[in-house]
């Protein structure tokens, strides 16, 4: 299933600072979007020595590992296309670690991607792809 929404604007500041702000705000908007659609966010930016999971959430009995991809344009491809096979393997390994630390290894899990497309001075467009990989 795919859901889409449109949110406020982000200013067109310096490139490096803007990219960081875009990532931080994109993750915040993604979490809000998920919660508005009945998904419970458990953790944001969970870290271990091997990496980070953007959002860990639940939808009923299903644990969701959600990768957030935020971009200001599509010059380098759509945000949803930015999850490489290497990234998928890495996220799966991180999810196994997260589940193992909580003794939840037998539970149902799902991997979603939330795309935040946010051109300078324009509203953000958010798309949620359930079961992306």
Curated annotation (Swiss-Prot):
GO terms for molecular function: nucleic acid binding. Pfam families: UPF0102 (PF02021). It comes from the Bacteria. Belongs to the UPF0102 family. This is UPF0102 protein SACE_6045.
């Amino acid at each position: 299933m795919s859901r889409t929404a449109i949110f406020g604007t982000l200013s067109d500041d310096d490139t490096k600072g803007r990219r960081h702000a875009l990532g931080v705000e994109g993750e915040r908007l993604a979490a809000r979007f998920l919660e508005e659609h009945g998904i419970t966010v458990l953790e944001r930016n969970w870290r271990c020595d091997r990496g980070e999971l953007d959002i860990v959430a639940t939808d009923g009995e299903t644990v969701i590992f959600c990768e957030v991809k935020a971009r200001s344009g599509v010059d380098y491809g759509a945000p949803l296309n930015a999850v490489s096979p290497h990234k998928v393997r890495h996220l799966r390994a991180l999810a196994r670690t997260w589940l193992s630390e909580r003794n939840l290894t037998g539970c149902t899990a799902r991997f979603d991607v939330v795309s935040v497309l946010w051109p300078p001075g324009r509203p953000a467009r958010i798309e949620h792809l359930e079961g992306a990989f």
